[in-house]
């Protein structure tokens, strides 16, 4: 790491140093390195390409879903979104995501990151409507799709459409293969909460009990079931 930082005038070295500092949660240093790499434009990744290297780093996106990123504008901005989110910088995260939606509008990882951050402000109706529109065509073919559907359901619920949200969560929960347990448990919890919201108390109770059988440590669940 020290050698990379000593050579951080090279965009690829700055990128590697930034990713390593991000994993160490040294956010100020990580941000400096990653912004330097991003500012290099087309020079980012050139040294790796010269020596036929394809470095990747793993980045958490949402609910147990991870992305593999490389030294490109997309990868660097996704890393900066994660960094901004960790620092509570919602405005910074939003700026990077808006750019990502321009350069990679069809990228499901970008969409998942966007909708997750958008749902941090559930009272912004225009933003919620944008989430609903952007996710309208999402199927349930991959774990990333399933994550997107979770946030689509949350947007629908926040707009006062709980039954539509329940339908989305039911579809999202039908495929469990390759889905992180954390994601599946959150889907079940959100659906149970919505059942309770629309007065389907027995169904809500059944969902909460099923969730407890699988994940008794789920935050607040034991209290919800009256077990504590």
Predicted regions and their residues:
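Structural motif corresponding to the intra-repeat A-B loop/turn of tetratricopeptide repeats
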Residues: 24, 87, 121-125, 159, ...
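Generic helix N-cap/helix-start motif at coil->alpha-helix transitions
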Residues: 8-14, 25, 29, 69-78, ...
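Alpha-helical adaptor scaffolds
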Residues: 112-189
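Terminal, low-structured helical/coil segments at or just beyond the last alpha-helical repeat
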Residues: 205-206, 210-228
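Alpha-helical repeat scaffolds
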Residues: 1-4, 29-37, 91-99, 125-139, ...
